[in-house]
Each structure stands twice: as structure tokens, then as C-alpha cells.
Amino acid sequence: MVQSSEAHGPEGRGGQDPAPVRRARLSGSVRLPPGYEPALFLFTPRGEKLWAEGWDPRFPAPAGDDAEPGTVFETSHGQVRTTWVVSAREPGRSVRYARIAHGRDAGTVTVTLDGAGAATVEYDLTALTDEAATGLARFAARYPEFLQDWEQAIADAACQPPA
């Protein structure tokens, strides 16, 4: 469930795609399966592979601890290549990534466990082009469904036998 969201750009255009936004600050919660430990692992580069279809981080330098601040990795989604840097971590509680989706947007993603079976997921993104501002507006409008998809994928993965 999205707790709050804020997008900066022109006002909406009644019934059409959302108006382009240059910056979006989005926050919402994802419920986690009961007893899943360590829960923060689900939101590390390697841990996300357990539940995020198509997620395949590549590390340009060896990374024994993939959530160590300073760790760099890359992902691809369609034609968009994204470079990620672990910028902060509080072990067992939170992790923050800086990310640049080349030619599209840049910003941070922060995941914080609440200690009661949920994670708060915050995106703070800035569009790098006019075209990206339209895509960012669509992402912001769909953020609640985006997190619901995450929640369902995590729940489905928790029900799978270990590989």
C-alpha cells in the first residue's frame, strides 16, 4: 500500500496519461511473508533474484557482500541499462541504492524494514529527458500496483521449495 507520493511537474490532463513530471518521491509498504529471515536479504542485488522475474545483477568487480556500501552493479530491463551503487546500509534494517537508468532517470531507492513484517520502499527519481518525464509520471501513477506486484512475487517465492 502506498503511504505517500509526491510528484513535481505540470498538473494532470484529465483522463489522459499523467502529466510529465521531472521528479517523483514515492513511498509505500510491502508486506513480507511471516517468518522470512533475513528479510532484508530479499532487497539485496542477489536476494532480489529469488522473486523478481528477469532481475539479473552483474557486478563489474567481485562482490562478496553485495549490500556493502560502495558495491556497484548493473541491471538491464528491455533496452534500459541501470547502474546501481549501494550508498548506505544499516544491517538487518535498511539499504539505500543510488541508481542511474542511462538516458532515462536517476535517483535513490531505499528499503527499510519496520520490524513488524513490512518493508517501506522509497523511490526518489528525477527524469533526465522530456520523454523520461512522461515515463516517470506513469511510474508514479502506477506505484501502488508496482508494490502490490512486488508483494505478490515475494509471497509466491516464499512458497517455492528451495532450489
Locations of the language-model features?
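Short beta-strand micro-motifs in enzyme catalytic cores
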Residues: 24-26, 71, 95, 109, ...
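Short, surface-exposed coil-to-beta transition loops
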Residues: 25-27, 79-84, 104-110
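Glycine-rich portal/gate segments that line the openings of hydrophobic small-molecule binding cavities
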Residues: 31, 47-53, 58-101, 156-161
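A short, structured loop/turn motif at beta-sheet edges
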Residues: 33-37, 87-92, 112-119
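Beta-strand/loop substructures that line and gate deep hydrophobic ligand-binding cavities in soluble
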Residues: 98-152, 156
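Compositionally biased non-globular segments, especially hydrophobic aliphatic-rich helices
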Residues: 10, 160-163
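Hydrophobic ligand-binding cavity/cleft-lining segments
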Residues: 2-65
